[in-house]
């Protein structure tokens, strides 16, 4: 299993080009199933989750391929509506194929998802909405079996989500585009990735209003056609690299990004003492001295994003004073705390709140990545630490950060990917 070996005391500085957002690319790929003619999607990141979803879509008999950062999809060859456990178990977003399959073909069988250690993240809101649209839903042996009402078409309805759910909003929005009649969705997620999905659906011929608000109105159409579309830049990748500048008195410019998508995070960076400058498609963070302490509460968009919580906690660990972070989106999202404490951080967790007392520096230590965003917080902490840090289970970071070693090296981080099993085998061969 691969590990990162990072030699610390780096000053993170330079320019880095931001990739397309994984959290936008996945629902966009799923939405391609709706189109009766070929679709082209640009700025698609090369990530494990993307490869998994492409493999799942190809398993339906659909012609789909990725060349560079472009994915093309032709659904005319579809053979089945079945998403097996072997693929879905590794990634929660696989459930997003349920909506388009059900809406376009009237039936679907999709394994219940896996792939995430952050709390329960139930899919009940997806299923509840599909039932409200007339679908017959059964869950048997770990699979969701869905069938549209007689006539093979979902029926528009009024539905209010019991909680703000990004995946639920996306799945139901996708399905509603081909429903008979009008669907009104209340308490929708407003994340930029949801907006990106709605915009692509409109480009395919869908009729969606209220984009970017908590209420979406979708007038169903008979069919959707393919289009050419580009994935929105990854705001979380952007924030992650900028956070590195704050931890190392660095100077980082992120290119091919959108400052408008990251305002709550940039505001906190400025509170912590960073100088933030922006252009149409770039953000620069300059830092001198130690960060100032801040208080952070994760909230649905447009609040502070939960996906930046771990990275900001790592910055707070080096602040000159005491910070507090309240995690209000997911339970069990402080799994990185024990690992940061192994590196010398002073953190106490009480329920949903973490109290972080700043220390002068991190110390190198062997640590383990526990989820995607936690893994990046450990990478940045290791870059700031004194000595060599070995980070285990880095497959998490490969799920969400494209070309991460190359980008970090370009910013001055001394990072190497190592494989203990392979390295040991090579050492044994030298002894023969």
From Swiss-Prot:
InterPro entries: Enolpyruvate_Tfrase_dom (IPR001986), Enolpyruvate_Tfrase_sf (IPR036968), MurA_subfamily (IPR050068), RNA3'P_cycl/enolpyr_Trfase_a/b (IPR013792), UDP_GlcNAc_COvinyl_MurA (IPR005750). The keyword Iron-sulfur does not apply. The keyword Membrane does not apply. It comes from the Bacteria. It catalyses: phosphoenolpyruvate + UDP-N-acetyl-alpha-D-glucosamine = UDP-N-acetyl-3-O-(1-carboxyvinyl)-alpha-D-glucosamine + phosphate. Belongs to the EPSP synthase family. MurA subfamily. This is UDP-N-acetylglucosamine 1-carboxyvinyltransferase. It comes from Psychrobacter sp. (strain PRwf-1).
């Amino acid at each position: 299993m691969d590990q990162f070996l990072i030699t610390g005391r780096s000053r993170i500085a330079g320019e880095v080009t931001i990739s397309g957002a994984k959290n936008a690319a996945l629902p966009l790929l799923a939405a391609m199933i709706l189109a009766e003619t070929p679709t082209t999607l640009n700025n698609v990141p090369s990530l494990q989750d993307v490869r998994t979803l492409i493999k799942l879509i190809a398993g339906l008999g659909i012609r789909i391929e990725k060349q560079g950062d472009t994915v093309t999809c032709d659904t005319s060859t579809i053979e089945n509506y079945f998403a097996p456990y072997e693929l879905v178990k590794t990634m929660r977003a696989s459930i997003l194929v349920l909506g388009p399959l059900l809406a376009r073909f009237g039936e679907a069988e999709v394994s219940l998802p896996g792939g995430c250690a952050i709390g329960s993240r139930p899919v009940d809101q997806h299923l509840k909405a599909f039932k409200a649209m007339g679908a017959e839903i059964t869950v048997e042996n770990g699979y969701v079996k869905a069938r549209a009402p007689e006539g093979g078409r979902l029926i528009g309805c009024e539905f209010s989500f019991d909680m703000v759910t990004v995946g639920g909003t996306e799945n139901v929005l996708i399905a509603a585009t081909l429903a008979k009649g009008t669907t009104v969705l209340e308490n929708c997620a407003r994340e930029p990735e949801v907006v990106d999905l709605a915009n692509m659906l409109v480009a395919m011929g869908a009729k969606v209003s209220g984009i970017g608000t908590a209420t979406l109105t979708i007038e169903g159409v008979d069919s959707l056609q393919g289009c050419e579309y580009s994935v929105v830049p990854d705001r979380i990748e952007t924030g992650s690299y900028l956070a590195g500048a704050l931890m190392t008195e660095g100077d980082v410019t992120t290119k091919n990004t959108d400052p408008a998508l990251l305002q709550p995070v940039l505001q906190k960076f400025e509170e912590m003492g960073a100088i933030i400058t922006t252009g149409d498609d770039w953000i620069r963070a300059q830092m001198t001295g130690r960060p100032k302490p801040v208080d952070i509460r994760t909230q649905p968009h447009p609040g502070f994003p939960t996906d930046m919580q771990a990275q900001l906690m790592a910055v707070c660990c080096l602040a000159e004073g005491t910070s507090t972070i309240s995690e209000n989106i997911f339970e069990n999202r402080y799994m990185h705390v024990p690992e940061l404490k192994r590196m010398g951080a002073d953190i106490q967790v009480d329920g949903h709140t973490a109290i972080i007392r700043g220390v002068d520096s991190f110390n190198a230590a062997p640590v383990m990545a526990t989820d995607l965003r936690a893994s990046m917080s450990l990478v940045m902490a290791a870059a700031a630490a004194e000595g060599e840090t070995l980070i285990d289970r880095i497959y998490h970071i490969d799920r969400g950060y494209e070309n991460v070693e190359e980008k970090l090296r370009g910013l001055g981080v001394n990072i190497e990917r190592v494989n203990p099993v392979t390295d040991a085998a090579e050492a044994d061969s030298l002894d023969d």
